């Protein structure tokens, strides 16, 4: 262990001398309180340390000890449904030790050392294995099997493998490597958080991550293994959108990072998720979720660690072959922590005081997402989808964090304050948002949902763009100056906005919409548009069309339960035909 002495304390930054033998990113223990820190800069024998706990009471002359290893997380059975702080300390255990206010220097194992897990081997003695091969599994929850993998850098033949109940530190397998050395394998691995976990090959993401949110799945989709940003001003619904994605996305594992946001938002997750049922498995959502809470009142430096901790845990499950979704709320708070540390290190500031390396740090985080061929001899694919909220002051997306994020991500869900104030949620602006995965998803949706899915989406998007042009004319000269055809477009796009894009996250049916239901809903609106166009050509007036009772039924169609969709929607389609046919007959009789 390398020992030094504190010479300066500046908030979360501590400078210690006598640290010549230490390394960059080594974990250190600061003072006799054993505060956790990490070396982030070296000058000769002086080390600058960012401390992940409250530094009040520290002073020059106190001891600093380098542990000689980087900041790492423990990976193994016991991660699912646990809530951690930013440096992977389980908050429930910390509460048992120190109560509601976390005391300094608390040391708690990330994974419980006493819990015994039922290990079932999947390999036999004499089998040849390489790094990443699955040697066995532990049924951690009803929906997640924690697959035990050969650690990175290990290759050889299985000499012994056991079955039964073990703790995470017990040896479950012994592998003889090519030099004849026996290597014991436990169910737990340690991995440095700043280092990307290896894989065999990165692939192009091409299948849709179904979120159940209509504006996302139909108009601005994200793939499994994609990256997305949700920028928006305060109160526009970033956190609720993140919660909706965490609840209903068809990922196998969800890692939710609350980075510098309100504590109440993490409380909502803890209260809601155990009560909600996953639409695919019927089990509690908590049984597939890992939570990392680093709320706004916790030490600023730990915000940076929380992002890396979360994505390393997500990569671990990706390596098992799972589809993982990671929510980071919010990356702006992480960037603010970088700015604070950069200022205390007296580095040259970049734009708006953020450090010059802001863009590269964001890229390092988002580039760890993707679809990969995992390590190991068997062919298995894993995906890691990263969705980051951005909180630009005043909703101004020209600020550095938003701009650096938009250069990296391929999906932009721009939240709009004016929509939020109109109570239109999700408040995703359909004119400014975009998805660069659209072409890949169109191919996937046409194959897996309906071969007309992408054509319907394109037609609806075109109508919404035409509406924005017509709105300018309406504001100048009024709606009566428009032709019946243009007024029909305004009526149909109102239906798309209010009946399709608007979604109530607190309604038990409307909160989640399957792809089939989304296709049928949009089909209803576009069928009405086509049939009404034909009626207008036969001299039916727009005033008669907008009084039809079927419009209300189209509006209420989103509350039809999944099992009744086809029968209910077929009935509404018949009503559209019948009511418009009656209008045409009536108009024909009047003309006679």
Curated annotation (Swiss-Prot):
Keywords: ATP synthesis, ATP-binding, Hydrogen ion transport, Ion transport, Nucleotide-binding, Translocase, Transport. GO terms for molecular function: ATP binding; ATP hydrolysis activity; proton-transporting ATP synthase activity, rotational mechanism; proton-transporting ATPase activity, rotational mechanism. It comes from the Bacteria. InterPro entries: AAA+_ATPase, ATP-synt_VA_C, ATP-synth_a_Xtn, ATP_synth_asu-like_sf, ATPase_a/bsu_AS, ATPase_F1/V1/A1_a/bsu_N, ATPase_F1/V1/A1_a/bsu_N_sf, ATPase_F1/V1/A1_a/bsu_nucl-bd. GO terms for cellular component: proton-transporting ATP synthase complex. It is an enzyme of class 7 (translocase). It holds the Pfam family ATP-synt_VA_C. It catalyses: ATP + H2O + 4 H(+)(in) = ADP + phosphate + 5 H(+)(out). Coiled coil: none annotated. Its EC number is 7.1.2.2. One of its GO terms (biological process) is proton motive force-driven plasma membrane ATP synthesis. ATP binds at residues 232-239. Produces ATP from ADP in the presence of a proton gradient across the membrane. The V-type alpha chain is a catalytic subunit. PANTHER family: H(+)-TRANSPORTING TWO-SECTOR ATPASE (PTHR43607:SF1), V-TYPE PROTON ATPASE CATALYTIC SUBUNIT A (PTHR43607). Belongs to the ATPase alpha/beta chains family. This is V-type ATP synthase alpha chain. It comes from Clostridioides difficile (strain 630) (Peptoclostridium difficile).
